[in-house]
Swiss-Prot record:
The lineage of its organism: Eukaryota, Metazoa, Spiralia, Lophotrochozoa, Mollusca. One of its GO terms (biological process) is venom-mediated perturbation of G protein-coupled receptor signaling in another organism. The modification 4-hydroxyproline is found at residue 46. GO terms for molecular function: acetylcholine receptor inhibitor activity; ion channel regulator activity; toxin activity. Residues 49-51 are annotated as: Lacks the Ser-Xaa-Pro motif that is crucial for potent interaction with nAChR. Disulfide bonds join 47-53, 48-61. Keywords: Acetylcholine receptor inhibiting toxin, Amidation, Disulfide bond, Hydroxylation, Ion channel impairing toxin, Neurotoxin, Postsynaptic neurotoxin, Secreted, Signal, Toxin. Residues 17-43 form a propeptide. This is Alpha-conotoxin EI. The keyword Zinc does not apply. The cysteine framework is I (CC-C-C). Alpha4/7 pattern.
């Protein structure tokens, strides 16, 4: 009975470790998208933060 218990614990640990490693790839992809969005926001023209300038220059601010 103790052997069965050890096998269950081992299987659970291995399964958990494998699933955690798989989620690391998804987390990395999400982090890349977030950093791209931050970089895009940081590159915006300062004019875009002023409502008057923003409305006068839609080609710059989108």
């Amino acid at each position: 009975m103790f052997t069965v218990f050890l096998l269950v614990v081992l299987a659970t640990t291995v399964g958990s470790f494998t699933l955690d490693r798989a989620s690391d790839g998804r987390d990395a992809a999400a982090n890349d998208k977030a950093s791209d969005l931050i970089a895009l926001t940081a590159r915006r023209d300062p004019c875009c933060y002023h409502p008057t300038c923003n409305m006068s220059n839609p080609q710059i601010c989108g």
